[in-house]
Regions:
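Amphipathic alpha-helical interaction modules
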Residues: 11-59
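Short helix-onset patch at the extreme N-terminus, typifying the N->h transition
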Residues: 7-9
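Generic structural concept
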Residues: 30, 55-58, 62, 77-80, ...
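Amphipathic alpha-helical binding modules
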Residues: 68-93
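Secondary-structure edge/capping motif, primarily at the C-terminal ends of alpha-helices
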Residues: 39-44, 61-68, 90-93
Length: 93
């Protein structure tokens, strides 16, 4: 799946309903990654601070994903895939 299609799917998805001690952190990661995606599609690139921030988001998601409730797995796995594709695309531009 290409980056644009995945981004469109993610934007159309509703925030999952769940209760977790990580919910606030996951919401922040979703917001930051979405902001990077918006910037990338507007500018066709990411600057160095955003690349660094996106890398940290991926690290944080990798730590949190094993503990997200099963019913939210699709949403956050898609977010993780989106961040990885975005980072790869930005590094090649």
């Amino acid at each position: 799946m290409d980056l644009r299609t995945l981004w469109d799917q993610h934007r159309a998805a509703a925030w999952p309903k769940f209760s977790s001690s990580s919910e606030g952190e996951l919401m922040t990661l979703d917001t930051v990654i979405s902001g990077c995606a918006t910037y990338y599609f507007d500018e066709r690139s990411l600057d160095a601070p955003r690349l660094l921030m996106l890398g940290h988001c991926l690290d944080d998601l990798d730590m949190l994903l094993p503990d997200v409730p099963e019913e939210t797995g699709e949403y956050f796995t898609r977010l993780r895939t989106l961040a990885g594709l975005l980072l790869d695309a930005a590094r090649t531009t």
